[in-house]
C-alpha cells in the first residue's frame, strides 16, 4: 500500500496493524459479520460479531481492536489507512457484496471515528488526484493539530493559512468560522481557540471533489500568475479535458513553483519537504 506514494512513502512512518489478525483469528480466517445494528453497537454491548460458521467472536475482535488502538496511540499515530467494506475497519460500509453498505461503521472504524483519527480509504490511494487530495489534507491536519495558538494573532494567522483549503472543502462552515473570527471580542480565549482548531481539523478530514480541485487550482494559478508574472503552460482550465495523471502533475507543479517563489498555494498550504 505504501508503495503507491512512490518516493514520498519515506515521508511517513508506517505502523501496520490489523485488529482481526491481532484478535487471534489468524490468516486465512473465516469471514466475519456484524449481527445487530452496527459496529458501534458492538462496542456498546448491543450487537455481536460472528464468523461464517456462526461462532461468536465478539470478545476476540474487541481484544484485537483495543490492542490496535493501543499500538497506534503508543506510536503517536493520528492518521489511519483503512479498508472500506471490512466489518472491523470499515467506516462507511462493512461489506463488499454488490452495492450494499452493510452495517457501518465497523467495530474498529467506530473507535477510530470516536478518537478523531484522520481516516484514508485504501482504495482512494490508487487515484493520483485522490491521493494528492488526501496527502495535502493530511499535512494540513497534522500542522493544525500541533501548531501553537497562544494569542489572537496566532489564531488569525492559523486561519489565514488554512482558510482557502477549508473553503474548498466546506464553504458554508468555513464562512461561518470567518464571520465568528471577525466578530471576536477583545482579548484571547484559549478554549474558543481550541474549539476552532478542532472545527478546522474536522473539515480537513473530509475529501474534496475533482470539480472543486480543478476550479481551485485554476483560481490559485491565476492569482499566482498575476502576482509573479510567471506562466505555467501545463496548468489547464477546469473545463479542459485531460486525464488524472495530468491533473496530478499540474497540482504538484503548482505546489513546487509556489514553494520556490514563496507564494502561498491556498489549496495545499502546508508542504512537507522531508525529514
Q: Model-derived features: where do they sit?
A:
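Charged, often glycine-rich, active-site loop that binds/positions anionic groups
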Residues: 28-46
Amino acid at each position: 500500500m505504501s508503495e503507491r506514494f512512490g518516493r514520498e512513502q519515506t515521508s511517513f512512518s508506517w505502523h501496520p496493524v490489523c485488529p482481526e489478525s491481532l484478535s487471534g483469528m489468524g490468516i486465512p480466517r473465516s469471514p466475519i459479520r456484524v449481527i445487530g445494528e452496527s459496529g458501534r453497537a458492538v462496542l456498546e454491548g448491543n450487537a455481536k460479531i460472528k464468523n461464517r460458521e456462526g461462532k461468536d467472536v465478539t470478545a476476540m475482535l474487541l481484544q484485537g481492536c483495543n490492542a490496535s488502538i493501543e499500538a497506534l496511540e503508543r506510536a503517536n499515530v493520528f492518521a489511519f489507512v483503512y479498508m472500506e467494506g471490512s466489518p472491523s475497519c470499515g467506516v462507511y460500509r462493512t461489506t463488499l457484496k454488490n452495492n450494499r453498505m452493510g452495517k457501518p461503521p465497523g467495530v474498529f472504524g467506530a473507535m477510530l471515528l470516536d478518537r478523531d483519527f484522520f481516516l484514508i480509504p485504501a482504495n482512494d490511494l490508487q487515484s493520483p488526484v485522490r491521493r494528492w487530495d488526501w496527502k495535502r489534507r493530511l499535512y494540513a491536519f497534522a500542522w493544525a493539530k500541533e501548531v501553537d495558538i497562544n494569542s489572537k494573532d496566532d489564531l488569525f494567522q492559523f486561519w489565514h493559512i488554512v482558510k482557502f483549503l477549508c473553503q474548498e472543502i466546506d464553504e458554508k462552515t468555513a464562512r461561518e468560522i470567518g464571520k465568528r473570527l471577525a466578530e471576536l471580542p477583545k482579548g484571547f480565549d484559549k478554549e474558543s481557540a481550541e474549539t476552532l482548531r478542532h472545527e478546522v481539523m474536522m473539515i480537513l478530514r473530509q475529501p474534496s471533489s475533482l470539480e472543486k480541485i480543478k476550479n481551485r487550482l485554476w483560481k490559485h494559478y491565476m492569482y499566482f500568475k498575476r502576482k509573479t508574472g510567471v506562466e505555467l503552460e501545463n496548468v489547464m482550465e477546469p473545463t479542459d479535458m485531460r486525464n488524472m495523471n495530468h491533473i496530478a502533475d499540474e497540482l504538484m507543479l503548482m505546489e513546487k513553483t509556489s514553494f520556490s517563489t514563496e507564494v502561498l498555494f491556498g489549496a495545499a498550504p502546508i508542504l512537507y519537504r522531508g525529514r
